[in-house]
A protein has these predicted regions:
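Short hydrophobic segments within beta-strands
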Residues: 15-20, 75, 98, 177-179
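Glycine-rich phosphate-binding loop signature in dinucleotide/nucleotide-binding domains
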Residues: 9, 67-70, 169-170, 228
Length: 232
């Protein structure tokens, strides 16, 4: 896990847990960091890609880092939203989730997915062909797409399913942004965990920050992050 700090002199801290394959060097991720940096000292967490234990490799390292921050607000995107939902630190203030990976709508029966996930294999060999610009967002760059994950292992699927099935109750300070046309994660899982007044929809792909309508929504993201779901 890599954590990069953007400090423009803001007094408040934001822990930004990026999605699966997101890196700070990607132009659209940097755009999001720049927006947050107008109000926060941003601690951007880059999650490791091929894992076998979500708690040991995603949640616990982020939680250990967060313990040293004091008070902070929390923003998680996709797999970062899954990780952030499990994060329990004394200093957490408001929580905002962007297209959180709380469930996946795959074109296979759940029994088949569970069978594949049960295989004792850690090598990523199952191809992923859905993470293109149509799915991610119309502003997705060639570099961003080329550097994204192209396969997963059964062990990865197994630990992600465990993370999704063991989510703690949503906190009162949580809000979420998602697109109903998201083909990467299942937006219905957001509606199952948060009431409608704590959810805002946007037009675009899985990544708000890689979608051309991002300018219309990012101020509301900042409002929810700074002031909580009542700001929506």
């Amino acid at each position: 896990m890599q954590i990069r700090v953007s400090d423009e002199g803001a007094a408040r801290d934001c822990l930004l847990v990026l999605g699966w394959g997101n890196r700070c060097r990607h132009r659209n991720v940097q755009w999001l960091i720049d927006q947050l940096a107008t109000a926060y000292r941003v601690h951007a967490v880059e999650l490791p890609t091929h894992i076998t234990d979500y708690r040991a490799e995603w949640v616990e390292p982020a939680q250990e880092y967060a313990a040293d921050l004091g008070a902070f607000d929390l923003l998680g995107h996709s797999a970062g939203g899954l990780t952030a939902a499990h994060l329990d630190a004394d200093g957490v203030g408001n929580r905002v989730y962007l297209s959180p990976w709380w469930d996946t709508d795959l074109p296979v029966p759940q029994s088949v997915l569970d069978a594949v996930a049960s295989l004792p294999i850690t090598r990523p060999f199952i191809p992923i062909n859905t993470l293109d610009a149509d799915a991610i967002g119309d502003l997705a760059t060639a570099r961003q797409l080329a550097e994204g994950p192209s396969s997963v292992s059964p062990a990865f699927l197994r630990t992600v399913l465990r993370a999704q099935r063991s989510l703690p109750p949503a906190r009162d300070t949580a809000a979420a942004f998602c697109s109903l046309t998201d083909t990467v994660v299942d937006p219905r899982a957001v509606g199952e965990r948060l009431s409608a007044d704590r959810i805002r929809l946007y037009d675009g792909g899985h990544e708000l920050f890689s979608s051309s309508g991002r300018e219309d929504t990012v101020e509301l993201v900042l409002d929810a992050l700074q002031h909580g779901p009542d700001a929506l």
